[in-house]
Amino acid sequence: MSDRLRIGTWNVEYAAGAAKNARRIARMREGEAAIWVLTETHDELVLGDGYHVLPTEQRPHGRAGGRWVAIASRFPFTRAIPTHDPLRTVAGMIETPLGAVIVCGTVLPWHTDPGPSGDSRSWVEHHRVVPEQAAEWAALRAAHPGVHLCVAGDLNTDLGGAHYYGTKRGRAALVEGLRAADLVCLTSTDRVPAGWLGHPPIDHICATASLAARASVVEAWDGTAPDGLRLSDHSALAVELRGPR
């Protein structure tokens, strides 16, 4: 059995359009990612029969089948793990070549997210939700001490490089939350090879610190295809995690 595992994440901009979905799927299947954490997705975007899918609940607005997050895995889920916010987060345990891994997919609030009240000011929701989700990551680590944890999805903040999107407060809270849960961001700007993306990523893959030294970004592409077709307003990334030698 291989001691390598590739995990990717992509915000697919609500997975609208059959022709665009075909292009999105083809692009993702070009690589070797065994697990994809898709955000702003839809049930119509199906990677193939070889994938097991664990989605969030139906989005309360928009067309039927819309999901904030769906985890698609070539390896079966051994269990689903309840989350505090089943609309925007989903978690499941997967037996992988590196052993058991809990994958937690999420969409953190963006700058104009109106929040439950419908009138939250810019970045207020992001600042409120990051500590809540960080506490959940730490709780998952405490409840499953022998299991690797991967948190991935649309974090709506760049990390580890020149400022692009986010706030100092939100970035600091996210960094501290990852640290407290023994997680390392594997897709910070400084970890993405120069020239691969037009802008620093705000979608990220984070994993247990013990895996970080043997992890690297292996794929990244912008949301607009080389022929000019817009497939998303977000870039996609994939990392490879390697087991001990």
Outline where the language-model segments fall:
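Short, ordered beta-strand-loop transition motifs
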Residues: 57-64, 82-86
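Extracytoplasmic/secreted cell-surface and envelope-processing proteins
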Residues: 46-47, 159
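Short, polar loop motifs at secondary-structure junctions
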Residues: 38-44, 210-211
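Proline-aspartate-enriched helix->loop->beta-strand connector
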Residues: 33-36
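Active-site regions of enzymes building and remodeling cell-envelope glycoconjugates
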Residues: 49-59
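Short, charged, surface-exposed secondary-structure boundary motifs
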Residues: 61-73
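Active-site regions of metal-assisted phosphoester/phosphodiester hydrolases
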Residues: 1-9, 13-26, 73-245
